Amino acid sequence: KVTAHIQPRVATADMVPGLAKILADDKPSLVIWQTGTTDAINGVAAEDFRTSLDDGVTAMENAGANVILMNMQYSPRTDSMLDVSTLADVMRIVAQQHNALLFDRLGIMRSWNDSGTFDLYTATKNYDMARRVHDCIGRALATQIISAAHLDAMRMQTTR
């Protein structure tokens, strides 16, 4: 069963209090947590972001869920206006501290833009390109999940 809890324009700190109920109700085995953009827009301090992210990941782990943190989307239009790299670094550190996966959407999309795979500077209402970008993101995420599942299966075999 797949469920989605979408909370647009909500900062990480504001999501954390509601996690306990969601986790208790849904009992997920995997949580993919996309966060950070609203925090960057609101200028949330890196340490405050880290604390909220750490609290959220801890709640997910305590509920028995595996965690994938997904960082922000890349946009050359907002690259000079928002400092997302600091919060993306915080996400990487929190993922490492919790032995969680990080899906580096920011890095992937930046690479696609820089290599010309996608022109992410084009009009924001280009729905065909947005669909193709999200399709590729979905495939990359699925690949990471499958790879992680294979690694976990291999670890389980070696510990038996």
Please provide the spans of the model-predicted regions:
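Surface-exposed acidic, glycine-flexible loop patches that form ligand/cofactor-binding
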Residues: 21-26, 58-59, 148-151
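Loop/turn elements at helix/coil->beta-strand transitions in domains of secreted/extracellular proteins
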Residues: 1, 26-32, 61-68, 97-101
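Active-site segments of SGNH/GDSL-like serine hydrolases
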Residues: 34-37, 56-88
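Conserved SGNH/GDSL esterase-like catalytic core that processes O-acyl groups on lipids
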Residues: 1-54
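Solvent-exposed loop/turn segments at secondary-structure junctions
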Residues: 7-13, 36-41, 66, 73-77, ...
